[in-house]
Amino acid sequence: METTYRREALTVRVIFCTSGDSAETIADVLTGAPTSASFFSVLHDLFYSQILAPRVTLKLCLPARRPGNGTRCSPVLVLRTDASVASGFLGGRPLEASDIKYMLLSDQTAGLFKPLLEIIGGARAPPNQDACTFQSQVAWLRTKFVTALRKLYKMTPSPYWMLSAFGAQEAQFVLTSSFYFFEHTVVCTTETVSHLSRLFSPQQGQTLVSVTSHEELGQLYGTSPFRRRVPAFVAYVKEKLARDSLETEAIDRTIDQIRGKLMLSNQDLVHFIYISFYQCLNKRAFLRYSRQTSSSSALRELGEDPQLCGALHGEFRDHVQSYYHKKTYLSTYIDIRYVGGVLPDGYFGGSLVGERCVYWCGQSKDTASLLATISQQVPHLRLQNEFAGMLDVAALRGSDDGQFKEGLFSHSQALPLYRCEFLGKQFFTMLQEDGLERYWEQSVIFPGDQDWDMLSDKDLTYRIFYHDLSLSLPTLKEQLLVSRHEYFNPRLPVYRWVLDFDLPVCRDIDRTFEEVHSLCCSLREAILDIIQLLGPVDPRTHPVYFFKSACPPDEWRGEDVASTSFCRCHDKLGMRIIVPFPEGVCVVGSEPMVALTGILNRTIKLDPELVHRFPSIQKKGGPFDCGIYGRGRSVRLPHCYKVGLVGELCRLLKILVCHPAPNGKAQYVRRAFTLRELLHHSPGHSAGHVGRIIYSIMDRNENFLENKTISYLPAKIPHIFQRIETLSGRSIEDWLHSAVWDKAYDTICKFFPDEKAQQFSHVAFTQQGENIIQLRPRQGRHFLCINHNHKNKSKTVRVFLTLHSIRVSEVTVTLMSQCFASKCNNNVPTAHFSFVVPVGLAS
């Protein structure tokens, strides 16, 4: 049954077009100039079939060029005509411009353009301004007026932009365009309305691909049966958007409730939010929700309670909350594997004490020569010719494998391997006897004979004095007493957990002893929580030794230092932390130590109080370096100096007493100056006895948020190099030169400084890995830093292209670089720009 519109006065908004230049045609109509153009109705807001009102007011509108959240169309002409004429016009019959002049309501139309004419008129007033009419104003300013219309409104000769924006199916176009132009109480994107139109009307009507003119589009709109459904569609959109808002607010609220109880790093937070939204809005859940909200009646049946956020309850929430809670994390997700047996020896005990230093030392060429000699004499050892072979030599013991050591030392035992910087060179040293403890006895002053247990940690720390040095010593033997680094040896058992702690801190902020000591106490608690997973210890008395890197000298700061200041470090606060494993426990291999330190990094990130006081703990992987347990990695010993660029001694690792137990402070301090208590592989008291040999430590859910996120991302196309070569018929290098590098080099020249861009004028490509192409300059192997102008302008920066594809028709190419400078995040890859290269990857 057709609906009629019974009003004495009816106003209809019409989106129109003309047969000629619309801006010029409007100016002709307003000035009374002769024109043969015709006006066509494209869209209008009269959604009923019959008009019974005798007269109709037509507001002819044009689409706004940049509407933002404002009005999408604005009237430019106001007409009044008979119902029959209006009905024909709205149904697709054109109106001639000559007829429109007689229908024009001049006063109302003039009111529409008054602000515009005032702006474009400016100081150029027409003659006889007092007697000037609206028609004469438009005529006087016609050129500017026409230009302004073109800037304000979208006037195109083709309907293609409308079909692209609102859809090429009849129902989709009619419903979406009508809502977009004539419904201003709800603001949402065209894509959203288009999606809702497909939900609202499964029947889409005829296709519009054959429509080539606004006239044809207007005729289709004027006769479309879907036009009558626009009011119902508007009501549905409002209900649907209200329901969507309810659901999204519930999702946000639930996510905030869950993450408010979690200690998440920035990276983990991004992954958590992505996974949370995926849980609620993945394809299956979204399609199910769309079916449940496809009509007004279905929306009413859904009830008032939100549906989508239910996916965040249950297993996912419990899993996240238990993993990101310190107690449940350590008790649930850490897997430790061990075997029972006699604990192996570490370093030979006699090599850690002595009245003097007895050692072998040499530089890189000497170690290579020694390894070559040993390999000739004892070939079955299969020693590496590189420095890693020295670690094998240091670990060998016994009359069989280690007999060649008797030519170097008086016995064949496992020895520590150190690195010492002297005279600007690196010396590698194995010691059979070590006078380091005796040197400490002579160069460090301890408190008097009073009861040390009566002193606080602060008093003890302040009453231990070092003999400060500032310059390297005359001989290598003396230099070994003040500066050395111990190498981690994967072939020896680990009895002590040596930790390298670097915490980024704010510049120009001094810290009191109490603040640093509180940090140490929190770290001690976290370390002992993990140590107790390996074996039983008394957390009140088990020693954890802290050695803080000395602050820069006062003169470096150029300002007064407050008397209460204990730490004046800027950029980072560095400490060496050492804790013995429980009695009857040792760890073998690098991997368990790396995993154990990674667990510690995660554990301290789960301490809300600690993170609140030191937010930088959450940065990157954590403040504890997991890389010091690899082959060929070394750390500076406590009570030793760092050697500067010109041989100066600085940043002494001084003891910071942190032993909360009321008793045992004297023993704690004395052991902190005992060499066997400070090394990775010095034997424990239980070496040679039956105990636990731990060979695997694993976080069962390590990086589970990241891994889960990756599993939800679109799958990458594998073997990308082979596919490109097969389908293009060219080698990767030829394809890069012809299809990739020109675009990459143009981008480099456009956005990089000239001195940085010119080094890329001639490059070679080297395939590295499955999807990495390394760039080589014409001269040398690497490039200058792209990010910063470092003082050291050496060409050490690695630049490469990564290829990534998730669509069979294109490859995403990213230019990346790695710089070793601390200002560039110490070799962390930096992405500079990406672009897409079309390629036929479909097989």
From Swiss-Prot:
Subcellular localization: Host nucleus
Zn finger intervals (CHC2-type): 785-824
GO molecular function: ATP binding; DNA-directed RNA polymerase activity; helicase activity; hydrolase activity; zinc ion binding
UniProt-listed GO biological process terms: bidirectional double-stranded viral DNA replication; DNA replication
Annotated keywords: ATP-binding, DNA replication, Helicase, Host nucleus, Hydrolase, Metal-binding, Nucleotide-binding, Transferase, Zinc, Zinc-finger
EC number of the protein: 2.7.7.-
Any single GO CC term annotated in Swiss-Prot or TrEMBL for this entry: host cell nucleus
Major location (coarse): host cell
Name of one Pfam family that matches: Herpes_UL52
Transmembrane segments: none
InterPro entries cross-referenced by the UniProt entry: HSV_PRIM
Family matches, as HAMAP family: HSV_PRIM
Subunit details: Associates with the helicase and the primase-associated factor to form the helicase-primase factor.
Function: Essential component of the helicase/primase complex. Unwinds the DNA at the replication forks and generates single-stranded DNA for both leading and lagging strand synthesis. The primase initiates primer synthesis and thereby produces large amount of short RNA primers on the lagging strand that the polymerase elongates using dNTPs.
Name of this chain's protein: DNA primase
Organism: Human herpesvirus 8 type P (isolate GK18) (HHV-8)
The gene coding this protein: ORF56
